[in-house]
Amino acid sequence: MPWEEPAGEKPSCSHSQKAFHMEPAQKPCFTTDMVTWALLCISAETVRGEAPSQPRGIPHRSPVSVDDLWLEKTQRKKLQKQAHVERRLHIGAVHKDGVKCWRKTIITSPESLNLPRRSHPLSQSAPTGLNHMGWPEHTPGTAMPDGALDTAVCADEVGSEEDLYDDLHSSSHHYSHPGGGGEQLAINELISDGSVVCAEALWDHVTMDDQELGFKAGDVIEVMDATNREWWWGRVADGEGWFPASFVRLRVNQDEPADDDAPLAGNSGAEDGGAEAQSSKDQMRTNVINEILSTERDYIKHLRDICEGYVRQCRKRADMFSEEQLRTIFGNIEDIYRCQKAFVKALEQRFNRERPHLSELGACFLEHQADFQIYSEYCNNHPNACVELSRLTKLSKYVYFFEACRLLQKMIDISLDGFLLTPVQKICKYPLQLAELLKYTHPQHRDFKDVEAALHAMKNVAQLINERKRRLENIDKIAQWQSSIEDWEGEDLLVRSSELIYSGELTRVTQPQAKSQQRMFFLFDHQLIYCKKDLLRRDVLYYKGRLDMDGLEVVDLEDGKDRDLHVSIKNAFRLHRGATGDSHLLCTRKPEQKQRWLKAFAREREQVQLDQETGFSITELQRKQAMLNASKQQVTGKPKAVGRPCYLTRQKHPALPSNRPQQQVLVLAEPRRKPSTFWHSISRLAPFRK
C-alpha cells in the first residue's frame, strides 16, 4: 500500500525534530519484533566495533531525514486507525449458497508499520537472509469457515491465486487448532442460532478432572461453546466439560438431513423431494472433497515451511547442529514432504472441477498406501525430537535461532515442536476424512468401492503406526522397572523384549524335591522373568531367573497327582521344552487366574509373530537411551509412580487455577482401537504402586 501525502501544510522542521526525539528508536512491543531486535542487538555486541561487510545482493539504504520519519509516523497512526475501523466493518455474516461465510480482515503486521530497518550485522545464531525479511501487505478477503479464502471475491484485489495462497498462510492459517480466524466466529454464530455443531475426536482425551470432558478417538462431540481458542465446552452422551480444541476435527457438513426427513414415495412431490435430497448429498460430498484438497494444500505448505525454513537453515549452521542432531529433530520429514507432493498432485489430477462430487479420490489413497507407512518412522522418532528440542531450547542462542527461522519463513506464532507435531496429527486425520467421504458416496458411485478400500487401508496404516508408537513408549517403563529390580543378572530386558504381556504371583514347584516357592512372574514378549519378594519390604523384588519363551510349550494340567513329581496339584500348567526336556510346573490360586495366564501365553506368541510380520524392532540407540534415562531417574527407596510417557501434549485449562496440575493426554490414537493391557498390567508391578 503506497504512502500518501497528508492533506494540509507539512509541519516545521523544529516540530518534526521534537517529535523525533520524543520516541528515539524504541524497541518493538510485539513478540516477533522483540526477537528480531534481540538478534540484532546480540550481533552488534558480538562484533564489538568491527564494521560488517555488506552482504551481497542487499542494496544500501539511503539516509532517512527527520521529516520523512515524522511523515512515516503520522501515516502509521493513520493506518492503524483505519485498520481498526475496517476490521469492525468487515466482520459480519455473508450468506452465499446457503453457507455462512465470514468477512475477515487480515491486519497488516505491526512490523511493516515500524521504522525502516537500518543495516545491522547479523547475529551468529541468526539464519542467513534475516535482513531480507519483511511483511507483505495484505488486503481483506472472504474467509470460509475452514479458513480458506474465496478466491473469486478478491482475485482482482490480491493478484494471482498462488500469491493469495502464500499471503493467506503467512498470516492466518490455523494448524494448532480447528478454531482459527473466521472459523471460530462461524462456530459461535451457529451455536448462538441454536444449531448443533459437531466435531470428531482425533485422539483420546484422558482426564481425571471433573471439569474436563473425556472421550475416545472417533467419538462425536457436540460443541456448545467455542469462545476460547484453545479450550471448548462440549457434550458427549450425558457428560459435559472442557476439552482441547486441537483434539477434534469439525465436521464439514454440520446441517445433515435426518433419515426420518426423507420424502414419502408414491407421488410427484416425493420424486422432487428425492431429487432434492440427492442434490443435497452431492453437495455434502463436494464439501468433503473440497476439505480434503484444502487441507492437503495447507499441509504441503506447512511441510515446505519446515523443510525450507528450519531444516535448510539448520544445515547451514554446522557449528550449531550436527547431522545426528538434525536426524533426531526432524526425522524423515523431507521424505514425507516428497511423498505428499506426489500425493497432492495425484489428487488434483482426479479432481473434477466442474462437478466436484463426481471426483474419484479413493484410488489415490490406494495407490499411495505404501508411501504412508513412512509416517511410522517419523512418529516413532517424534519423542526423541521433543527431548532434543527441550535440551537445546534451554540455551538462548537456539531459542533466538528457531524464532528467527520462523520469522524469516513468515510462519505463524507456534514453537518448532508444535510444527513438528503436524505429521503425527495428519496421519490420524485421514481415516476420519475418508469415513465422512464414504458416508456421502452413493453405493452406485464409481468411487464407492475405492473409498471403502481406502478407508480400510488408512485405518490399518494408522493402527500400525499407533501400535509401534505405543510399543516404543513402553520401553522407558520397562527400563525403569528393570533398574528397580535388585540383583539383576544377564542381559538387559530390552535386548529381546519390548512389552509386558501379563504379570502375577505364581507357585513354582521345583525338581527334584518338589519344593514350592512363591514368586512374582512377569511375562514379556520372548521371555518370562520371575522374582522374589523381600520378606520385610514387600515392594522390593529380587531377580531369580528367566525362561526363554521361544520354543516353550504351554501344557494345561488337570487337577490331581502329577506323574513326574508325584505331588498333588491344582490350577496348574507346565512349561515344557521338547528339545532339552526342561519342564517347569506352575500353579495359581484360583481357576480364573489360570485361564488368564493361559490366554496371556497365547497372546505372547501372537505378538511375537506379528512383530516378525511387520518388522518391528528396537534399535540399539533406543535401548541405550531408555537405559540411560532409567539410570538418571533411579532414586533410593521406593520408586514413585511413573506418569504417562513424554510423548504427550500439555494444555492449559482456561477456567482452572494456573497452579492446578495439568492433565497429560495421549495425542496419538486410532479410533476404536483394541484397548491396551499394558497400563493395567504395569500397575500390578510393585515399583509402580503408590
From Swiss-Prot:
The lineage of its organism: Eukaryota, Metazoa, Chordata, Craniata, Vertebrata. Isoform 3 interacts with RHOA and RAC1, and (via ABR domain) with APC. Found in a complex consisting of ARHGEF4, APC and CTNNB1. Residues 499-606 form the PH domain. Keywords: Cell membrane, Cell projection, Cytoplasm, Guanine-nucleotide releasing factor, Membrane, SH3 domain. Gene3D superfamilies: Dbl homology (DH) domain, Pleckstrin-homology domain (PH domain)/Phosphotyrosine-binding domain (PTB), SH3 Domains. This is Rho guanine nucleotide exchange factor 4. One of its GO terms (cellular component) is cytosol. The keyword Transport does not apply. It comes from the Eukaryota. Residues 194-253 form the SH3 domain. InterPro entries: DBL_dom_sf, DH_dom, GDS_CDC24_CS, PH-like_dom_sf, PH_domain, SH3-like_dom_sf, SH3_domain, SOS1_NGEF_PH. Residues 113-145, 257-282 are annotated as: Disordered. Changing residue 100 to R: In a breast cancer sample; somatic mutation.
